[in-house]
């Protein structure tokens, strides 16, 4: 069991490092994630666009798994939402899904992997 003082310190750290400007993201959304990349002494933002196939909610360790198909090859990346490397997250389109994890999209190709759009 953690002491009360230790728990307060952990809560303060969570409050300091959590981002406040994150839009509500659901499974099946098409998102555009801006990732900060440092090359030498230059810093730039590279955007990664794809479908959210999984989300793990764990306070400051919340992650998104985003999948896109690039030149016929499926590419998945896992992003820590509250990481300083993640610059921005923008929801481009919402889809109607009835699963919490969309791992079955890995086996679908072409038009079969499309999701039905939902207007919010």
UniProtKB/Swiss-Prot annotation:
The keyword Metal-binding does not apply. It comes from the Eukaryota. GO terms for cellular component: chloroplast; mitochondrial large ribosomal subunit. Keywords: Chloroplast, Plastid, Ribonucleoprotein, Ribosomal protein. PROSITE patterns: RIBOSOMAL_L19 (PS01015). One of its GO terms (biological process) is translation. HAMAP family: Ribosomal_bL19. Belongs to the bacterial ribosomal protein bL19 family. This is Large ribosomal subunit protein bL19c. It comes from Trieres chinensis. The lineage of its organism: Eukaryota, Sar, Stramenopiles, Ochrophyta, Bacillariophyta.
């Amino acid at each position: 069991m953690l002491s009360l003082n230790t728990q307060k310190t952990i809560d303060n750290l969570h409050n300091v490092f959590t981002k406040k400007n994150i839009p509500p993201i659901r499974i099946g959304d098409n998102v555009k994630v801006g990732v900060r990349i440092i090359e030498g002494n230059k810093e730039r933002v590279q955007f990664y666009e794809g479908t959210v196939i999984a989300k793990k909610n764990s306070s400051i360790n919340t992650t998104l798994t985003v999948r896109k198909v690039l030149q016929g090859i499926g590419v998945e990346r896992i992003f820590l939402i509250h990481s300083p490397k993640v610059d921005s997250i923008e929801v481009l389109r919402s889809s109607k899904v009835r699963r919490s994890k969309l791992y079955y999209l890995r086996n679908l190709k072409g038009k079969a992997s499309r999701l039905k759009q939902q207007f919010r």
